[in-house]
């Protein structure tokens, strides 16, 4: 089969935003205008096509990112058919992992902001994640019909708060109830969408007289930004003072692809104004799979290789999401980077080193699916029938093995104990938790060694609430949930040199393992670093990995209070062995003994998750809010002006002090203040609190 749409006419984009910026509504409108859904789904009616889990429809938030394929020809049918793959990403901070996964496989993004609340904390998180993966993006300032909506104020915040370089290509005509339409600064015409047919048709009109001056000022900014794309354009602009429409568009595209500028548009998805213009901008300015750098990976011999977006290259794809579907079982969402694969083809999972077979391939349209026979470079689709694939695995051609860059996932910060209500629930709970953990790498399941309780940990209270809710609904498991616990960690601040000796020699086959280890802190975030400096074969090669295993096992069970130990560098530099009695087990135990002893001598400390907290409050309550944050061991980082005279307080607060904060804040401010929080880093716990934690854990 030949390719239906040339790859340069593909756009793989994500729609990202803060909770409530109107991201799902925007995606719904896109599906409506591209002809996929005949009735527009409203989020507040719980009928949006992209939000297909029951919990999403009830809570009005998007939890999993659904991938949808649509086609677009332009507002005036000025383009050939372009295939747009849209991934709708959740905006709630507990689901940052979903955003991270989506950005990893996208070529471009549309970031949606609310016209009245502007740049909010989660917007900064999404923006930083997009920076990390160098994703070219554009901005849609939505909800221009809302009270307090101000497009240029939001553009200003994007510049100052996000450090970006926004270039508006539109201006709004009117705002709040009087929002009429937008001015296209390239054509210098006003676009007026017809309300009678839900904005399907529109007319170009002259710019209102009172806005001509403002439009000309912003038009000049736009042309200047375009001229900076190259010296030739700059010379032409300086000589003639103008560029052609085609030159402007080409230049803006080039600078967007280089992440030098971010084009800004505005509208109101709910009022059906401005969304088609966003689609046009996606096609004109965001990259196709061949406009972004080739993905890098490593081959079997650890050499770096590149895979280009080309059907003739060997097949390579990244599994970026696993979802359980009520009808077909497990769906593995993949982004194909190179080559072609057909249904029934065998592929190789290079991370797990296992062969897999593509049973069926489906293209998702929100929660409807269409079976297809093949996928090609640039496609995003879901495969059915893959047995052992987890998020972040690479699927490739078994003759051309490659491991594409792995994704990094955040450490969970909050933990609760769950207990099945009955014997029947026990077995079902194990299966349910296993499936849910396979879908979501930021959710972990473990068993407490002492109490035998099942502990689940995640990115926040909402995250775990939804997991428990899904166990009940999808797997009909009833369970009792304990109080949330903070996921503390341990590390060392000093150095130590220690001996670990495990000897049992009382007749018959004995045990003999003997090691000398240096312990010191590794770089923050580096995890466990093991260095082998054994010389002269004092410990045989085959036992060295056992020493590392022993250390790692002891790290997982902690030394001070039983919490996992982070960021340690262990150097094995000496030891001895016995010809008969030495074994892998003996050296593993010796390594574990040495680590426990050494860590206790190297100034061990307990770490706690610090959260970045932003509280938005009327000025009258500012003193109370700041006083309360200080009582919670918070560090106030700064204050900003919010909309409508509200104040924004930015602070770092330990997670352990934030339980129940929502209720306390509501009662302290008569419900007028709101807050958001996200994980920032692990920091050392003050001595008095550390002592209390150790005592409570009975160490």
From Swiss-Prot:
Keywords: Cytoplasm, Elongation factor, GTP-binding, Nucleotide-binding, Protein biosynthesis. SUPFAM superfamilies: EF-G C-terminal domain-like (SSF54980), P-loop containing nucleoside triphosphate hydrolases (SSF52540), Ribosomal protein S5 domain 2-like (SSF54211), Translation proteins (SSF50447). Belongs to the TRAFAC class translation factor GTPase superfamily. Classic translation factor GTPase family. EF-G/EF-2 subfamily. One of its GO terms (molecular function) is GTP binding. It comes from Vibrio vulnificus (strain CMCP6). It comes from the Bacteria. The keyword Ribonucleoprotein does not apply. The keyword Secreted does not apply. Catalyzes the GTP-dependent ribosomal translocation step during translation elongation. During this step, the ribosome changes from the pre-translocational (PRE) to the post-translocational (POST) state as the newly formed A-site-bound peptidyl-tRNA and P-site-bound deacylated tRNA move to the P and E sites, respectively. Catalyzes the coordinated movement of the two tRNA molecules, the mRNA and conformational changes in the ribosome. This is Elongation factor G. One of its GO terms (biological process) is ribosome disassembly. One of its GO terms (cellular component) is cytoplasm. InterPro entries: EFG_II, EFG_III, EFG_III/V, EFG_IV, EFG_V, EFG_V-like, EFTu-like_2, G_TR_CS. GTP binds at residues 17-24, 88-92, 142-145. Residues 8-290 form the tr-type G domain. HAMAP family: EF_G_EF_2_B. It is found in: Cytoplasm.
């Amino acid at each position: 089969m030949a390719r239906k749409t040339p790859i340069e006419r593909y756009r793989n984009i994500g729609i990202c935003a803060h909770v409530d910026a109107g991201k799902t509504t925007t995606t719904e409108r896109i599906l409506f205008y591209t002809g996929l859904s005949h009735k527009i789904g409203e989020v507040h009616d719980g009928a949006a096509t992209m939000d297909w889990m029951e919990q999403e429809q009830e809570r009005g938030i998007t939890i999993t990112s659904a991938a949808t394929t649509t086609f677009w020809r332009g507002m005036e049918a000025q383009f050939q058919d372009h295939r747009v793959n849209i991934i709708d990403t959740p905006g709630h901070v507990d689901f940052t992992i979903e955003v991270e996964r989506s950005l990893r496989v996208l070529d471009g993004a549309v970031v949606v902001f609310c016209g009245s609340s502007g740049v909010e904390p989660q917007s900064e998180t999404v923006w930083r994640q997009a920076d990390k993966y160098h994703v070219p993006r554009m901005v849609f300032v939505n909800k221009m019909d809302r009270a307090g909506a101000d497009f240029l104020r939001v553009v200003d915040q994007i510049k100052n708060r996000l450090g970006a370089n926004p270039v508006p290509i539109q201006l709004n005509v009117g705002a709040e109830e009087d929002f009429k339409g937008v001015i296209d600064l390239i054509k210098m015409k006003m676009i007026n969408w017809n309300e009678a047919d839900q904005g399907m048709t529109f007319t170009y009109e002259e710019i209102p007289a009172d806005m001509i001056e403002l439009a000309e000022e912003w038009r000049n900014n736009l042309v200047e930004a375009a001229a900076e794309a190259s010296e030739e354009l700059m010379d032409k602009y300086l000589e003639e003072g103008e560029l052609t429409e085609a030159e402007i568009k080409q230049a803006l595209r080039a600078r967007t692809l280089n992440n030098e500028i971010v084009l800004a548009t505005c509208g109101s998805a709910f009022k059906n104004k401005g969304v088609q213009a966003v689609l046009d901008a996606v096609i004109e300015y965001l990259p196709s799979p061949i406009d972004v750098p080739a993905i890098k990976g490593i081959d079997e011999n650890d050499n770096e290789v590149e895979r280009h977006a080309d059907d003739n290259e060997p097949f390579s794809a990244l599994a970026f999401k696993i979802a359980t579907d009520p009808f077909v079982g497990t769906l593995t969402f993949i982004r194909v980077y190179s080559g072609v694969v057909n249904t029934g083809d065998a592929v190789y999972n290079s991370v797990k080193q296992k062969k897999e077979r593509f049973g069926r391939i489906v293209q998702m349209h929100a929660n409807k699916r269409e079976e297809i026979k093949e996928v090609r470079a640039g496609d995003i689709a879901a495969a059915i029938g893959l047995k052992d694939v987890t998020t972040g695995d690479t699927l490739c051609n078994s003759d051309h093995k490659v491991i594409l860059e792995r994704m990094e996932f955040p450490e969970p910060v909050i933990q609760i104990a769950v207990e099945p209500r009955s014997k029947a629930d026990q077995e079902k709970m194990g299966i349910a938790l296993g499936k849910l953990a396979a879908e979501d790498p930021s959710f972990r399941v473990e068993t407490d060694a002492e109490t035998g309780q099942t502990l689940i940990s995640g990115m926040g209270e909402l995250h775990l609430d939804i997991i428990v809710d899904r166990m009940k609904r999808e797997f009909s498991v009833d369970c009792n949930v304990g109080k949330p616990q903070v996921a503390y960690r341990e590390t060392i601040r000093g150095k130590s040199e220690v001996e670990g000796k495990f000897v049992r020699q009382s007749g018959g086959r004995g045990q003999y393992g003997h090691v000398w280890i240096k312990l010191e802190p590794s770089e923050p975030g580096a995890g466990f670093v093991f260095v082998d400096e054994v010389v002269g074969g004092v410990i045989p090669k085959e036992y060295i990995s056992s020493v590392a295993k022993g250390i790692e096992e002891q790290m997982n069970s902690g030394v001070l209070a039983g919490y996992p130990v982070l960021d340690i560098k262990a150097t094995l530099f000496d030891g001895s062995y016995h010809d008969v009695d030495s074994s892998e087990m003996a050296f593993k135990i010796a390594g574990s003994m040495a680590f426990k002893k050494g860590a206790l001598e190297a100034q061990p400390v307990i770490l706690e998750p610090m959260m970045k907290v932003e509280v938005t409050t009327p000025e009258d309550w500012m003193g109370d809010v700041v006083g309360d944050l200080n009582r919670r061991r918070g560090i106030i980082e700064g204050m900003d002006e919010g909309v409508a005279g509200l104040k924004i307080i930015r602070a770092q607060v330990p997670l352990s002090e934030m339980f129940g904060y929502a209720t306390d804040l509501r009662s302290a401010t008569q419900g007028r203040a709101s807050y958001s929080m996200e994980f920032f880093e692990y920091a050392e716990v003050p001595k008095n609190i550390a002592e209390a934690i150790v005592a409570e854990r009975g160490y």
